[in-house]
Amino acid sequence: MESETLFAEEAEPPGSRTGNGLQLYNEHVVTSLDTLFTLTAVPDRPAPRLSAFSDSRASAFRKRFFPNTTLKEWNDWHWQLRNRIRDAETLGRMIRLSEDELHAMIGAAGAIPLAITPYYMSLIDPWNPRQALRRTVVPTVHEHFRSSGEADDPLHEDEDSPVPGIVHRYPDRVLFLVTGICATYCRYCTRSRMVGHQGNHCLNTEQWEKGIAYIAAHPEIRDVLLSGGDPLTLADEQLEWLLANLRRIPHVEMIRIGTKAPVVLPQRITPALVKMLKRYHPLWISIHTAHPDELTPDVARACARLADAGIPLGSQTVLLSGINDDVETMTRLVHGLLKIRVKPYYLYQCDPIPGSSHFRTPVSKGLEVIRGLRGFTTGYAVPTYVIDAPGGGGKIPLLPEYVEGREEGDLLLRNYAGKVFRYPDCPAADSVIH
């Protein structure tokens, strides 16, 4: 049966399996609803209102569920990976599972395996299944229903892959998928077909070498985005091997890393990692975020280390129904990101992967969010709203309509407040009388 694989020669980050004989979620088949109800050890009580999370919350969680773990161990990213929550039994001891969550774990597992770092688990409300952060990482029964228009590879990345791990869609840049492993799996991941599994998407050093060779043989490639999976689940030495080999290619001008590690595994951003990354400028990092409640002091410290090293930081956010698809939540998110030196970069319409209909919003909601940001806050806070077109069409930007039309040669423009203004549009050059 397929399970997480980092490399053929190293099946997992060292010691990352859950202890006490517990298995991976996608290997653990639960057959009894009653069994799962007995695993739910969280007592019944009113759901508290959770706002800004703090270090004290993580500390309380650690002392309750990992009482023999020192603060030093908790802050070790290897420990966090080894102790991820990856099965129904462990999850049921930490949160009171809803009926939808329970049913999601009965019988065959969904396409996306379960893995949540203890750090990120400490942010999850144990009593409220509608909490935004909880919905992004805990499976529900909705994942098992496939809707019209959904596809395993909606963006046709596999069709645009000349060699394993390389997606070459745009003229001057490539996507380099270097691992299928993530520290925490998002339930709406566009690469649900590959994350956490092996088979055709098992990435290893041999495939890395083929990817490097392809990039070196194509001088039009000036920009390489390392993604996966999450490249920051790799060891420093593995990541440096990739960066060093890319830097040896004269026509590669910039390297980017796409990651959610600063948000779900901030312990990964160590001084040693940052010192290594500084050697490979210009290097950019795109941080995947979903909700303002993710922006804890730990995340702020991780981003500060990266920014202080001269690494420009941008964010990528997927628009998710009932999670961040309102102006107030998105405003808090983009303002919070700017305060920790992360530029809101892209807001993605959720990709139609199988079992994603409960996450996807009408495009009109995304336009409403952008309309509610533009003009009402600084331009630095406004991400570009895009649809990554199904069928491999690439990112297509979407904007609210601000051009009202023309009148007597003037362009009629509607501003953020809904007022219409006239702009004396220049005539075409060949119609100007000299």
Regions found by a protein language model. Give the residues of each.
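Flexible, acidic/Gly-rich N-terminal and inter-domain linker regions that tether
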Residues: 1-168
